């Protein structure tokens, strides 16, 4: 251990000055600690890389993995997710890729920071290596639909939240050590070969439990009696709530004392009437017996039907958002076409269509081309699923357009397309999910004194990001490729002041609208007439978007139901009459020294919404002009604090 010695000299001057040797020692120590930390971080990631490469080399797989030493493990390896600091692997998701055989030891068990392990729907077999169930940080384990065997291991991770080992060949008893998993909320062990009693899990925070279709026996612990009967069905030797009550070992003794009764006197009859009595009695008894048997059969059938209906009702009651999602954006999926979700190269997602249909769904919004859903899959993966409506294109044309959208979407300011699905009745698109919302919600949502307004700097940065994204689409897609649906709700916030565009390139797939709406909204005048979108019509729509950002008003204003005025016309009328600050968003009035920049941005917008398409600038020109505003801003020092002063009146030539 390194020790530091200080010497104090008592004298007329009480000053403590560290020696040069001490400072040098501190500096060396600091560099040593920093270097050691970085070395450990690099070593951890290299160790994880070698462990995964060893796993891929030892376990055959039908689907090709892009794992190699040249690709960056955290950025491009399929199914691999790293920690936020990029020092180790924290999630491995490889469902349904055809993994075959046992998991070798000293491979996945060396991923010491692993939190999520999903190898479901493969052909894996054998026992789970001890080093896997000894991983200390596992939160979610999905190993269902494989052929694992042996006893269910005792997982040591105290933070284990979900454990799914269903549809395997595990044998033996359910470990009593599961009581120690205080954070466990979901346990799925159905369709195995487990035997023995059900352990008491009263110390566990279970919300979902399924032990059905095993060989369990004994009484169900009272702490688990609140789960539905479907959680325990298929275990014939299991009893207790919610199943049938457990029978006692021997019948209880009768409380009624035994009283001997004398035999009944013989029924008097004549010898000659013996045959007549026999015939007259047999026929009614036979008829009555048949009627009784028929009645019993009917009662049994009614009970079975009622029990089946009751079971189906209970199943309906426990349906989650999963089934709701399947009905919403999976209602048109055809059974023969399941699992035909098409992923694009470079996509790190690894799930199939059935996983997507099982995901919980939340409606994000309904737009011109369909409804967008936030889908949360079971491995904590969140994506956006766009369910398209009124698609007129055939399968080949649809697939070709998806390829183009994926190719041109490779830009920081564009939301990338990750996968798609096509069938006769259902068309789906899968994109990344960004939790920060969109520009429309920032501008118009929850306006008032309690809302933090979107400041001017953020508005300019967001506008510039969107402009760069559209300019990239025009350059990468060629002269015939346009966005076609530019609006504030399609400007998605990646993080603060950083945005990207979505919902582009879908116009060629859609049926031609029957008639335009009364208000123009974001659409250029020529689009209202020809129904054709071009680069210039995108420029017009982007000009409307800038006006929306400047004014804080929606692009279609309705002073009254009978009088609808589009935003460009309203701004032009205000400017032509006499320029006032009323055209700008009132929430911008608190910021100082931004009048000149707002006027410059307004001039850009008015150039974009020119009636004649040829007069409008290109998107590259728009990007350049906005960047010039940013340059002038950096050269001018102005306070960023709030101020109640209003911008001065300015003159704008339109």
Curated annotation (Swiss-Prot):
<keyword id="KW-0067">ATP-binding</keyword>
<feature type="transmembrane region" description="Helical">
    <location>
        <begin position="282"/>
        <end position="302"/>
    </location>
</feature>
<keyword id="KW-0433">Leucine-rich repeat</keyword>
<dbReference type="Pfam" id="PF08263">
    <property type="entry name" value="LRRNT_2"/>
</dbReference>
<feature type="region of interest" description="Disordered">
    <location>
        <begin position="630"/>
        <end position="654"/>
    </location>
</feature>
<feature type="signal peptide">
    <location>
        <begin position="1"/>
        <end position="38"/>
    </location>
</feature>
<keyword id="KW-0472">Membrane</keyword>
<dbReference type="GO" id="GO:0005524">
    <property type="term" value="F:ATP binding"/>
</dbReference>
<dbReference type="GO" id="GO:0004672">
    <property type="term" value="F:protein kinase activity"/>
</dbReference>
<keyword id="KW-0732">Signal</keyword>
<keyword id="KW-1133">Transmembrane helix</keyword>
<feature type="compositionally biased region" description="Pro residues">
    <location>
        <begin position="250"/>
        <end position="267"/>
    </location>
</feature>
<feature type="binding site">
    <location>
        <position position="386"/>
    </location>
    <ligand>
        <name>ATP</name>
    </ligand>
</feature>
<feature type="repeat" description="LRR 1">
    <location>
        <begin position="113"/>
        <end position="135"/>
    </location>
</feature>
<protein>
    <recommendedName>
        <fullName>Probable inactive receptor kinase At5g58300</fullName>
    </recommendedName>
</protein>
<feature type="region of interest" description="Disordered">
    <location>
        <begin position="250"/>
        <end position="272"/>
    </location>
</feature>
<dbReference type="Pfam" id="PF13855">
    <property type="entry name" value="LRR_8"/>
</dbReference>
<dbReference type="Pfam" id="PF07714">
    <property type="entry name" value="PK_Tyr_Ser-Thr"/>
</dbReference>
<feature type="modified residue" description="Phosphoserine">
    <location>
        <position position="441"/>
    </location>
</feature>
<feature type="repeat" description="LRR 5">
    <location>
        <begin position="205"/>
        <end position="228"/>
    </location>
</feature>
<dbReference type="InterPro" id="IPR001245">
    <property type="entry name" value="Ser-Thr/Tyr_kinase_cat_dom"/>
</dbReference>
<comment type="similarity">
    <text>Belongs to the protein kinase superfamily.</text>
</comment>
<dbReference type="InterPro" id="IPR013210">
    <property type="entry name" value="LRR_N_plant-typ"/>
</dbReference>
<feature type="modified residue" description="Phosphothreonine">
    <location>
        <position position="381"/>
    </location>
</feature>
<feature type="modified residue" description="Phosphothreonine">
    <location>
        <position position="530"/>
    </location>
</feature>
<dbReference type="Pfam" id="PF00560">
    <property type="entry name" value="LRR_1"/>
</dbReference>
<dbReference type="GO" id="GO:0005886">
    <property type="term" value="C:plasma membrane"/>
</dbReference>
<feature type="domain" description="Protein kinase">
    <location>
        <begin position="358"/>
        <end position="631"/>
    </location>
</feature>
<feature type="binding site">
    <location>
        <begin position="364"/>
        <end position="372"/>
    </location>
    <ligand>
        <name>ATP</name>
    </ligand>
</feature>
<feature type="repeat" description="LRR 4">
    <location>
        <begin position="183"/>
        <end position="204"/>
    </location>
</feature>
<dbReference type="InterPro" id="IPR017441">
    <property type="entry name" value="Protein_kinase_ATP_BS"/>
</dbReference>
<keyword id="KW-0675">Receptor</keyword>
<dbReference type="InterPro" id="IPR001611">
    <property type="entry name" value="Leu-rich_rpt"/>
</dbReference>
<keyword id="KW-0812">Transmembrane</keyword>
<keyword id="KW-0677">Repeat</keyword>
<keyword id="KW-0547">Nucleotide-binding</keyword>
<feature type="repeat" description="LRR 3">
    <location>
        <begin position="159"/>
        <end position="182"/>
    </location>
</feature>
<dbReference type="InterPro" id="IPR000719">
    <property type="entry name" value="Prot_kinase_dom"/>
</dbReference>
<dbReference type="InterPro" id="IPR050994">
    <property type="entry name" value="At_inactive_RLKs"/>
</dbReference>
<feature type="repeat" description="LRR 2">
    <location>
        <begin position="137"/>
        <end position="158"/>
    </location>
</feature>
<dbReference type="InterPro" id="IPR032675">
    <property type="entry name" value="LRR_dom_sf"/>
</dbReference>
<feature type="modified residue" description="Phosphoserine">
    <location>
        <position position="360"/>
    </location>
</feature>
């Amino acid at each position: 251990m390194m020790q530091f010695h200080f010497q104090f000299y008592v004298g007329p001057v009480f000053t403590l000055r560290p020696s040069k040797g001490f400072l040098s020692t501190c500096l060396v120590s600091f560099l040593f600690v920093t270097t050691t930390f970085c070395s450990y971080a690099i070593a951890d990631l290299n160790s994880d890389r070698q462990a995964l490469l060893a796993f891929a080399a030892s376990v055959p797989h039908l689907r090709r993995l892009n794992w190699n030493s040249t690709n960056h493990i955290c950025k491009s390896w399929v199914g691999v997710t790293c920690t936020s600091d990029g020092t180790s692997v924290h999630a491995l998701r490889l469902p349904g890729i055809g993994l075959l055989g046992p998991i070798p030891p000293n491979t996945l068990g060396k991923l010491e920071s692993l939190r999520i392990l999903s190898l479901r729907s493969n052909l894996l077999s054998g026992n789970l290596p001890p080093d896997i169930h000894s991983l200390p940080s596992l939160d979610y384990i999905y190993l269902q639909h494989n052929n694992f065997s042996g006893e269910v291991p005792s997982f040591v991770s105290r933070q284990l939240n979900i454990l799914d080992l269903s549809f395997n060949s595990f044998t033996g008893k359910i470990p009593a050590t599961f009581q120690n998993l205080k954070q466990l909320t979901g346990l799925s062990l159905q369709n195995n070969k487990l035997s023995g009693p059900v352990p008491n899990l009263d110390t566990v925070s279970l919300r979902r439990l399924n032990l059905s279709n095993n060989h369990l026996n004994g009484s169900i612990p009272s702490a688990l009696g609140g789960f539905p009967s479907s959680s325990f069905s298929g275990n014939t030797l299991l009893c207790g709530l919610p199943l049938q009550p457990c029978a006692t070992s021997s019948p209880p003794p009768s409380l009624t004392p035994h009283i001997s009764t004398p035999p009944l006197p013989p029924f008097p009859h004549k010898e000659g009437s013996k045959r007549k009595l026999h015939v007259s009695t047999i026929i009614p008894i036979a008829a009555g017996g048949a009627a009784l048997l028929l009645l019993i059969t009917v009662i049994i059938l009614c009970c079975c039907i009622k029990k089946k209906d009751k079971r189906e009702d209970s199943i309906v009651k426990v349906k989650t958002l999963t089934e709701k999602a399947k009905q919403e954006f999976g209602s048109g999926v055809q059974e023969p076409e399941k699992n035909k979700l098409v992923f694009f190269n470079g996509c790190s997602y690894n799930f199939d269509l059935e996983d997507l249909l099982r995901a919980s769904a939340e409606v994000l919004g309904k737009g011109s081309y369909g409804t967008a859903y936030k889908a949360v899959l079971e491995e904590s993966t969140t994506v956006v699923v766009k369910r398209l409506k009124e698609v007129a294109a055939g399968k080949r044309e649809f697939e070709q357009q998806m390829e183009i959208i994926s190719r041109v979407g490779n830009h920081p300011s564009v939301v990338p397309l990750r996968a798609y699905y096509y069938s006769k009745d259902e068309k789906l698109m899968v994109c990344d999910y960004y939790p920060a919302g969109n520009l429309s919600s920032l501008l118009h949502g929850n306006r008032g004194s309690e809302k933090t307004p979107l400041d001017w700097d953020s508005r300019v940065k967001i506008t510039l990001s969107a402009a760069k994204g559209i300019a990239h689409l025009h350059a990468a897609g060629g002269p015939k490729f346009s966005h076609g649906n530019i609006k504030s709700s399609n400007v998605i916030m990646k993080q603060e002041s950083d945005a990207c565009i979505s919902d582009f390139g879908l116009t060629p797939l859609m049926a031609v609208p029957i008639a335009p709406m009364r208000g123009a909204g974001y659409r250029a005048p020529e689009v209202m007439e020809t129904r054709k979108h071009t680069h210039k019509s995108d420029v017009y729509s982007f000009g409307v978007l800038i006006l929306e950002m400047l004014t804080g008003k929606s692009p279609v204003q309705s002073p009254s139901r009978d009088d609808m005025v589009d935003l460009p016309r309203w701004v032009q009328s205000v400017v032509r009459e006499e320029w006032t600050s009323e055209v700008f968003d009132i929430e911008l009035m608190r910021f100082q020294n931004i009048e000149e920049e707002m006027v410059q941005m307004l001039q850009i917008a008015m150039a974009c919404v020119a009636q004649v398409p040829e007069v409008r600038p290109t998107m590259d020109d728009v990007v350049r002009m906005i960047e010039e505003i940013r340059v002038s801003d950096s050269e001018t020092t102005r306070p960023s604090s709030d101020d109640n002063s209003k911008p001065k009146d300015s003159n704008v030539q339109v």
